Every structure is written in C-alpha cells, then in structure tokens.
Amino acid sequence: MKQLTPRQAEVLALIRSAVQQTGMPPTRAEIASELGFKSANAAEEHLKALARKGVIRMMPGTSRGIQLLTDEPEEDEGLPLIGRVAAGEPILAQQHIETHYQIDGSLFHPRADFLLRVHGMSMKNIGILDGDLLAVHKTTQANNGQVVVARVGDDEVTVKRFERKGHIVQLLPENEELQPIVVDLTQENLSIEGLAVGVIRNGNWL
C-alpha cells in the first residue's frame, strides 16, 4: 500500500470516524467543512487519491459513495504517537510520528485516532501529567467543558479545557499556577485538533 500524505491520512481518519459513529461515510461537503477545505471539489480530489492508493472505493451516483477497503496504514501498526508538533504544521504530519502503539482505538469513546505525548503540567489537576500519552479523537468540534487539543493561530498545539462565550474562547489549564489562554475569534484563528478521550501512563489506561 502506498504511503498517504498527511492530508490524505486526515481524510481517511475522518471517514473511519464517521463510519464508526454513524454507520455511514461522510459526504464530500461534510469532509470539506470538517477539514477546512474551500470546496467539496477539494475533498473529491483527496478521495480520488485515496482510491488510487487502494484504501477506499468510490461508488458513483451517491453523495456518500465511499467504501473503506482496508484499515488506515497507521492502524495496522497501532495508533500513531505524536510528539512535539512544530508550529503551523499538520498534527498528523509524518515527521511528528515517533512510533506506533498496538492499541485498538475503538476501545475509547469516541474512537481514538492518535496518541499525543503530553508536555508540561498544565493539566495536572485532572491527572494529565508530563510524559503521559493522551488518546485523542480527531475532530474540529468541541463543547464547553471538554478537554481539547487546540492550536491558536500557527502556534504549537496545546491541551486545555475548552470554554466559549460568544466570540471569546478560553483555553483553561487545570493548574492554579497558570493563566488561561484567551482567544478573541474576531482577531485570532483557533483550530480544534481533537478531543481527549483517555490517558495512558506507563502502559496503563487511567
């Protein structure tokens, strides 16, 4: 199987997640909206590339005509472990993957798509410690109170609790020594990379 680009891997992860949660693949428009493409045509081009690489089959005549043929390459090896993510780069870029863990993502709810190595103690009060592996479900949507993997502008990703009121978002640490990150959505871009769905420490789920 040919190696996927980071964007193709994101599209494939989204398809797998949609099938897992709803029993059906997403439409082209849904893929474009979820991943920030300018049009459904851009999503179509990525789907054609995935079909050429043998991981999906496209069925004409239906907006949800996508059939998964094989597991995502990373799943054959386990969940990818993402180390430190450079500013402005896709979180699933190949250069960020340190290794793979033989963990079934469906054991988490919602399904885990990757693991992220935690740096720092900003979430220590809820048991997320420096060096832990955070199981993450890839999505661009978050509700108030959820722990998210987020990126402000082109900065590195951060793990914080999400709170939004109007156009103001606070990314709240669980550490009384640290201050929230306040984002005015009219002035800055905020990207949600995923939701925290579990913590692994020393090989054990917490």
From Swiss-Prot:
Gene3D superfamilies named in the record: Umud Fragment, subunit A, Winged helix-like DNA-binding domain superfamily/Winged helix DNA-binding domain
Annotated Pfam families: LexA_DNA_bind (PF01726), Peptidase_S24 (PF00717)
Keywords for the protein's UniProt record, in alphabetical order: Autocatalytic cleavage, DNA damage, DNA repair, DNA replication, DNA-binding, Hydrolase, Repressor, SOS response, Transcription, Transcription regulation
EC number: 3.4.21.88
Keyword Repressor among record annotations: yes
Catalysed reactions listed for this entry: Hydrolysis of Ala-|-Gly bond in repressor LexA
GO molecular function: DNA binding; serine-type endopeptidase activity
Any one GO BP annotation for this protein: DNA repair
Binding partners and assembly: Homodimer.
PANTHER family membership: LEXA REPRESSOR, LEXA REPRESSOR-RELATED
HAMAP family reported in the protein's UniProt record: LexA
Database matches in NCBIfam families: lexA
Name used for this protein in its record: LexA repressor
Organism: Tolumonas auensis (strain DSM 9187 / NBRC 110442 / TA 4)
